[in-house]
């Protein structure tokens, strides 16, 4: 493999990287999209996302689904994983966590389109689902439903 590739600037992939202590210090990395100009959808699913309630410090859990139609850039998946892990000890409400993740990705990638669904497990008996997207979905790309069922409990 040649010395200078689209992966040459990556700092985290292929090496030991500590989990960032906060989302603010987490470094998201991107690589050039080798299929730029071809409309397609990328999906990341994080079924065990966690953060902390900013009031009680109790853990909150969510199933996240991130879909995006890339332009020039792709997110490097290890850096995304570490970014999501950085929320483990971060206190914020469900809405803030979900939208912050979406906006950080938009700022980094400048995608054609992005959406994130945060399907939060109940706290205080109420599940909270949070949805953010950059605009109408492109018509020329297959974008599957997120497929996360409404919370039912034992009912």
From Swiss-Prot:
SUPFAM superfamilies assigned: Tetrahydrobiopterin biosynthesis enzymes-like
Taxonomic lineage: Bacteria, Pseudomonadati, Pseudomonadota, Alphaproteobacteria, Hyphomicrobiales
Family from the record: Belongs to the GTP cyclohydrolase I family. QueF type 1 subfamily.
Pfam families associated with the record: QueF (PF14489)
Pathway in which this enzyme or protein is active: tRNA modification; tRNA-queuosine biosynthesis
Annotated positions binding substrate: 75-77, 94-95
Catalytic activity: 7-aminomethyl-7-carbaguanine + 2 NADP(+) = 7-cyano-7-deazaguanine + 2 NADPH + 3 H(+)
Catalytic activity, EC: 1.7.1.13
Protein name per Swiss-Prot or TrEMBL: NADPH-dependent 7-cyano-7-deazaguanine reductase
Cited InterPro entries: GTP-CH-I_C/QueF, NADPH_dep_7-cyano-7-deazaG_red, QueF, QueF_type1
Organism per entry: Brucella abortus (strain 2308)
UniProt keyword terms in alphabetical order: Cytoplasm, NADP, Oxidoreductase, Queuosine biosynthesis
